[in-house]
Amino acid sequence: MDLVVVLGLCLSCLLLPSLWKQSHGGGKLPPGPTPFPILGNVLQLDFKDLSKSLTNLSKVYGPVFTVYLGMKPTVVVHGYEAVKEALVDLGHELSGRSRFLVTAKLNKGFGVIFSNGKRWTETRRFSLMTLRNFGMGKRSIEERVQEEAHCLVEELRKTNASPCDPTFILGAAPCNVICSVIFQNRFDYTDQDFLSLMGKFNENFKILNSPWVQFCNCFPILFDYFPGSHRKAVKNIFYVKNYITEQIKEHQKSLDINNPRDFIDCFLIKMEQEKCNQQSEFTIENLLTTVSDVFMAGTETTSTTLRYGLLLLMKHPEVIAKVQEEIERVIGRHRSPCMQDRSRMPYTDATVHEIQRYINLIPNNVPHTTICNLKFRNYLIPKGTDVLTSLSSVLHDDKEFPNPDRFDPGHFLDASGNFRKSDYFMPFSTGKRVCVGEALARMELFLFLTAILQNFTPKPLVNPNNVDENPFSSGIVRVPPLYRVSFIPV
């Protein structure tokens, strides 16, 4: 009898993968590795470098294939043509967000990153318009970034060319830009509220980038019933939302609907305009989560790019020299960089683009979800299926970028030395779900890096050839190793 039970269990295990595929919404999913019962393909994937695992699978199954993260199928799209087709040509059909991601559970469907449907459409449209139009009749966002760039330079000057870890300073600058846009005012770098906020965002960034949280994404039951670092992330989010709630209350007391001071004011005015609409998406809960989203997305990603960028520049002092020569020729020493300078600085512009391309910050994009049954190439993908697009396969395409694993600003220059645009440049994703803060992030990266190199030459503590550029972690986001640098005044 025991032998019969064992054989029955073994047979069930063998049949279960095919039953999964046949029963999932009647669709015809792309091929992929055979999943194990319950676990799916998680044992065949390296969550410390998921991008590499998916690239290896694409060599076997082609540009579109299926992996099972637990019992949930995820369609993986690899290579420029397939990614463009998915995110641009089928942008509407693939505009959903998974409800099973840990971050989606934390946000409860609110905000601008993990919301869906009407709420996402209206919140995204409002956020884009507010960020784009912000500064009309007031200080522009560019002026706020320039002010922060000046403060950043002064903080670096205080190091007196001594070796330092730049992590905090390079995190404080983009965080303060967001504070200026959201709360009207920037903070001093020693302000305790500011330090606490930065600490919570930084800790959550590490937690959400950990293999454990990626594992929780595969098995959502772990999030609800098991201990782990995700519990700390929940506490941190409560802390941040409590702080934002107090800021909102202060804004409500002094709100002038004819003179909005910042993002919160604009949202509160929109709430007032729609107060008679019981179906309005402009609520306090949505404001809280949207502000949290803007902070999380607009601080850590820009900070990490700046840190990784400086590390690469230290490894390539010849690039620093060329950028500084261009800065001297176009800007000089007696004024701050501005965005109008960028069109006259092709090498600097190319360097900023190459930093983003090379570091491949978010290799696999944030997962999309089909909002309807979808025919994609020769496959039928059911509504509610997660789709993972490999941005890494686009940014490191060897046809568009010869020697893609080499850091070379020439990837974005033509034969005459002019800046060359590329459709393959999509570190912010592309299509309907492209990053809301793309324009702000591009501005910050150009102005911050240009201001730093206008005033300093970053020097490593080792020979440039020995600078370690390998990522400290390659989870959802690629994070550079910790390092020390000397900022030598120019």
UniProtKB/Swiss-Prot annotation:
Write down the PROSITE patterns for this protein, in alphabetical order. Answer: CYTOCHROME_P450 (PS00086)
Q: Name one GO biological process term.
A: organic acid metabolic process
Q: Which reaction does it catalyse?
A: an organic molecule + reduced [NADPH--hemoprotein reductase] + O2 = an alcohol + oxidized [NADPH--hemoprotein reductase] + H2O + H(+)
Highest taxon of the source? Answer: Eukaryota
Q: Which cofactor does it need?
A: heme
Report how it sits in the membrane. Answer: Peripheral membrane protein
SUPFAM superfamilies xrefs: Cytochrome P450
Q: Name one GO molecular function term.
A: iron ion binding
InterPro entries recorded for this chain? Cyt_P450 (IPR001128), Cyt_P450_CS (IPR017972), Cyt_P450_E_grp-I (IPR002401), Cyt_P450_sf (IPR036396), Cytochrome_P450_fam2 (IPR050182)
Tell what triggers its expression: By phenobarbital.
Transmembrane intervals = none
Got a GO cellular component term for this one?
endoplasmic reticulum membrane
- Please tell me whether the keyword Heme is annotated for this protein: yes
What are the subcellular locations of this protein?
Answer: Endoplasmic reticulum membrane; Microsome membrane
Keyword hit for Cell wall biogenesis/degradation: no
Give UniProt keywords alphabetically.
Endoplasmic reticulum, Heme, Iron, Membrane, Metal-binding, Microsome, Monooxygenase, Oxidoreductase
Catalytic class of the enzyme: oxidoreductase
Query: Which EC numbers characterise this protein's activity in its record?
Result: 1.14.14.1
Q: Where does heme bind?
A: C435
Sum up the protein's function in the record's words: Cytochromes P450 are a group of heme-thiolate monooxygenases. In liver microsomes, this enzyme is involved in an NADPH-dependent electron transport pathway. It oxidizes a variety of structurally unrelated compounds, including steroids, fatty acids, and xenobiotics. In the epoxidation of arachidonic acid it generates only 14,15- and 11,12-cis-epoxyeicosatrienoic acids.
What is stated as this protein's family in its record?
Belongs to the cytochrome P450 family.
**What name does UniProt use for this protein?**
Cytochrome P450 2C2
Source species of the chain: Oryctolagus cuniculus
Gene that encodes it = CYP2C2
